[in-house]
């Protein structure tokens, strides 16, 4: 199965397209659909397949790379990293949480307070 077969973007979702792509790749890694070493389509190829701008896919790939979920090997392409997907997913979630906390002007201790009060399911 190819990435384009299950990767979808919804312009009406109220969530940025690059973030939809990023989240779906993370979900694919966590579910085992994208095992370590899987080569992802080029930015242009995936953008063309999904009907989105190349910059949208490029931003999703950059964010995935900064969270160590994918690694770019120069002209050889972009691949799913060999790191533990749980670690990579949690790093991405933490980065997003920190970004929101900073945007709200919270201190580190205030942000941590919110985490300690999350109810158990």
From Swiss-Prot:
The family database entries (SMART domains) matched by this protein are listed as:
HTH_GNTR
Q: What is the protein's name according to its record?
A: HTH-type transcriptional regulator Rv1152
The protein's role, per its UniProt record: Transcriptional regulator that modulates resistance to vancomycin and aminoglycosides. Negatively regulates the expression of several genes responsive to vancomycin, resulting in decreased susceptibility of bacteria to vancomycin. Negatively regulates the expression of genes encoding the ribosome binding protein Hsp, the small subunit of sulfate adenylyltransferase CysD, the L-lysine-epsilon aminotransferase LAT and the protease HtpX. Also modulates purine metabolism and aminoglycoside antibiotic resistance.
DNA-binding region residue numbers: 43-62
Tell where it localizes: Cytoplasm; Secreted, Cell wall
MF terms from GO for this chain are: DNA binding; DNA-binding transcription factor activity
Q: Which keywords label this protein?
A: Cell wall, Cytoplasm, DNA-binding, Secreted, Transcription, Transcription regulation
Q: Name one Pfam family in it.
A: GntR
All copies of the HTH gntR-type domain together span 15-83
| Domain of life the protein comes from | Bacteria
Anything further noted?
Overexpression of Rv1152 in M.smegmatis modifies its response to surface and acid stress. Overexpression also confers M.smegmatis reduced susceptibility to vancomycin.
One GO cellular component assignment for this chain's record is: cytoplasm
Disulfide bond sites: none
Q: Which CDD domains match?
A: WHTH_GntR
